[in-house]
Amino acid sequence: MVKQIYILILLVVSTLAYTQPVPNVEENIPYLMTFGHMAETSWGDDDFSQAFFFLIPQEYDQPFFIRVFDPDTGGAIDELAGEFNTRQVYEVYGGESVWTEVDARETSPLGNYKSGTLLASRAFAENPRYDNGWYTFGPFNPAQGEYVEMFKGRIFKIICEGVAGDDGNMYRYYLSTDADANRPIEGANAFAYEYSFRMHNDYEEVAHIYPYVEDGTISVKISNFDWDVDGNIVVISVARQGREVKVSGEDLWADDELRVLDEEIGTSFDFRFVKARPLVKNNNVVVNVRNQRGETMPFYTIPIGGVPKYRGEVEFVPID
């Protein structure tokens, strides 16, 4: 009970900014990424499927919408592999077991990962109408989500899958109160258990993701796929200034383990993705984190407890 109350307080504090693009501003990630299922995994997508969860606070009782930016695969943003031949399907789920089903919180599209009740779906191929534009799912009634006591809110899920072709789809989401504009829901948040995304084509830009460290976490295993030796992944927290983790090569996974410090419990890590020089362009990567029990850890787009800042003393090395 104490754990649930603590998480709830942190959720309230963290979502006061109300900004709900996915990826969020603090993450500085250009696009989510999903390839068609005929693509080579060396393009950076390990399983051609990505799930995100939206948390609607219990106080909110009005219709809402899930908007998708550039939902088609074709045009300026998406990644071409020969000719555009890719079809992607977006599916929105609510109802019982949409989040509480264990398979829904796993990192691979296996078992009952499409748990819950299908509320809406739409397939997109190359379509200039939606290139650099928005498609809106909804309206949805908050009561259609799964109520989760720990969050004091209702959960919805959206899955994007590449069901045909071999091109890369770059896209974003926005949780909105308006079908035609991006208007945030106060107190809402979004999270995922695996992040598949496009890195910036600019080595001055640093991307971030923020896994939350729950009570009882002793150690974490950080896994990344197809990093392509594109610089460094650095972990920042309230108790550590920066710890580099192992990075993967092309079409490979790399794992690294990190012992959790007492001060880090109930806060978020800041995983910083620092690009290499010379510039590696169009790099797509996949990241997930598990605790010592093998359970997946959530990445909140609005970090729980806020963006972590190192609280210790900064060491200065004098210049001779």
Briefly describe each language-model feature range:
Residues 2-10:
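Sec-dependent signal peptide recognition
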Residues 12-16:
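N-terminal signal peptide c-region/cleavage motif recognized by signal peptidases
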Residues 20-31, 52, 80-83, 88-98, ...:
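C-terminal edge strands of extracellular/lumenal beta-sandwich accessory domains
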Residues 38-49, 195-201:
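Extracellular beta-rich ligand/substrate-recognition surface
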Residues 47-49, 58-65, 213-219:
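Extended extracellular/luminal ectodomain segments enriched in beta-structured repeat modules
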Residues 64-108:
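Mid-chain, structured segments of secreted extracytoplasmic proteins
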Residues 97-121, 243-260:
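Acidic Ser/Thr/Pro-rich low-complexity disordered segments
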Residues 111, 115-152, 257-280:
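Beta-sandwich interaction modules
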